[in-house]
């Protein structure tokens, strides 16, 4: 498994070039409206979306666009992660967390893919990054953070879909665990 996309911008450009990303240029409220649109797109295996003018809680338009549904299908997620089948990413992660040292001692060449993946993962230190081009005072209310559901306790930065597999039955569970 190699990570095929090194930056979010490259991934979004790829999606847009392939007709898998739409842009909404009209203002869209980050409380419920953006989430409802993304929910419909996910349920219909639709394209990724960029809200170019997300409307914040105070009614102002954020200068920062909001991207949603960028991993909205299994195929899109596998492509983003450079995987050829659905279990590859999980299998590689398990292999990295619990490598079979005995197998590697007998057949050292089997460790090469694992070593390649591990070496590709460490952070790279840079003096300046693209994220430092825009400087602003810290104010989280100025970020287009969605509030997705009416009973949510607030706006959540993360909304991951976590897939787990029961080791006995093999059944899968899809859950959301947010911060």
Predicted features, each with a name:
Residues 1-179:
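Extended, highly charged
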